Every structure is written in structure tokens, then in C-alpha cells.
């Protein structure tokens, strides 16, 4: 299978890249359930004969409406007549599951050489597409890379300071940059090694938004930070079981 790199990298100098790797599982679709409403209406002037309204089906938009209706068994009990068909349990709600988006997250790293803050959000639109938003604010020297990876991605350091994706677990995803902005300059502040002095350091701000399709089942954020005095690798994954009716069983 072809090697895919979809990792976006925030460099203090202002370069941005995006690569996504994933597994070929997609979020399960949902269908609108249907139910039949059967009503019986007695004919008052003809004894021992009853007429029935023809059954009709309509989509159920919200299963909570069923709580406002009396069960068919109780309705027939009040009228003193038996029901025509056995009662069936109501189908589950047809609400669209948005299991891919899991809200805001941030990473704040402070070292002698760099002060870094990264914020982001992943939004599932419920139609097979999702948006990725990132912002980064850095003062000093260092590199930060942020990737969208599957849960099977190992957390480890790389000598080349890049994130490589195994070919067997890769798949091509459609992503395009919607918006990007980079600002660079110099900022003066108290020196970390000597607070009595004032130092001038590089300052960079950047933000970007991507629109992607064909997401994998569970997405994790993978952060790798490298500087002259510190390095960090971290993977953050959402609680998939909280968003889905079916449990998630990781593989790989």
C-alpha cells in the first residue's frame, strides 16, 4: 500500500504542513427508523362489526415523542377491545452520530529556549467530512509538529524529527487547506537565565484550517516537540465509547 504522509508541522519559522494517516474504517451510518400506527374505530350503529383505518407509516424523527403516547395495549383496555397486533418496542432514535469531532484541546510547553502554546479543534459535520483547526503561538527557538493519527500509532522519538507512517496502516485521505495565516516578529522580555536583563527573541503566530473527508473510525492527536534543551512526544485520543453505541476494539 502506498505510503501516505498527512501530518501538518508547525515550525517557529512559520512553515505548515498537513498529512493524515489512518485505517479504512469509517463511521457507521444511521438510517431513519419507521413504525406503523394502527388505530381502530368502532362503528356505533352496526353491532358486532368494526372498521379499521388503513395502516400508514411515517418516519420517526425523535423517539422521545413515544413517551407522550399511551401504549396500544392500554388504549384498547380503556375501550374494552383487544388490539389487532402485538405491541412492538420503539426503534432507536435516528439522530446522526458525530463520533469524529471531540471538541477543544491545547498543549502548553515552556522551556528555557521556547514558550509555546498550541490550541485546536476537530469538528465532525456529520456528512462524512470534518474540519481541523489549529493555532500556535511561540516565542523562542524550537519545532512543533502536530499529526492526526490512528490509535495504533506508536509514541516514540525519531532521530530525523519527523513522523513516519507505516505503509500497511496508511490510506489516502482528501484534505484541502481552507485558510492559513502566519505572522512573525521579535519580542522583548526578561531573560530566563538572568531576569535582570532584557532579551529579544523570535515570535511567531500561525493558524490554519483544513477540510477533510473519508475519516477513519477514531482520530488521535500526535504532538512531537523538539528544541535545544527539551523534547516531548505525546498522543491524545478521544473517548470513542462515549460517542458511539457500539464499543471500539483497537487493532494493530
UniProtKB/Swiss-Prot annotation:
GO molecular function: signaling receptor binding
Signal peptide stretch: 1-22
Sugar-bearing residue positions: 62, 127, 137, 143
Subcellular location(s) of the protein: Secreted
Post-translational modification: May be proteolytically processed at the boundary between the N-terminal non-conserved and the central conserved domain in neuron-like cells.
Family recorded in the similarity comment: Belongs to the neurexophilin family.
Region described as V (Cys-rich): spans on this chain: 167-252
Statement: the UniProt record of this protein carries the keyword Transmembrane helix: no
Gene name for this UniProt entry: NXPH3
Protein name per its UniProtKB record: Neurexophilin-3
IV (linker domain): region residues: 158-166
Chain residue ranges for the region called III: 76-157
Native species: Homo sapiens (Human)
InterPro entries: Nxph, NXPH/NXPE
GO cellular component term, pick one: extracellular region
